[in-house]
Regions:
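A polyanion-binding, active-site-adjacent surface
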Residues: 17-143
Length: 143
């Protein structure tokens, strides 16, 4: 993230989406962890056979959903061929295939599937993010 993070920002609900949008742009542009950035890019170049025709996201994955949500879902890190490929948390992998139908049934998702960014999925009163924003090698972040 940029070095300007010491600025105070308004915390009213009206300003929250703007601040979250700014944070997500900073996350996407982040290059603080050379090991993780290199791994994300490498995975994006050396693709799984099933995804050879995909243009991998291959950069830090921002959060997704309703900025004023009452439900926060926190994952560990993006999957190398899931979120690192699609650019959206829990999208395009087994964990998303399990989670999104449940969220849809509970009224937190507009549809039961999550294939890629721009597929029409919207979260309702829910926000999904991860503790680590880049797919780590062997799915194991360092402390």
């Amino acid at each position: 993230m940029s070095g300007n993070s010491t600025q105070s920002t308004p915390t009213t609900s009206n300003s929250l989406p703007v601040n979250l949008d700014l944070l997500n742009h900073e996350i996407i542009a982040c290059v603080r962890c050379p090991r993780l950035i290199a791994h994300c890019r490498k995975v994006g170049e050396i693709k799984r056979r099933a995804y050879l025709d995909w243009d991998y996201w291959a950069k830090p994955v921002p959060g997704f959903g309703d900025p004023n949500a009452r439900l926060l879902i926190l994952g560990l890190a993006p999957g190398a061929h899931g979120s690192n490929r699609t650019g959206r948390p829990f999208t395009g992998d087994g964990s998303g295939n399990f989670m999104y139908p449940i969220l849809h049934k509970a009224g937190f998702a507009s549809q039961p599937t999550a294939i890629k960014r721009g597929d029409g999925l919207e979260l309702i009163d829910a926000y999904i993010t991860a503790a680590v924003r880049c797919a780590p090698p062997e799915n194991k972040p360092l402390p």
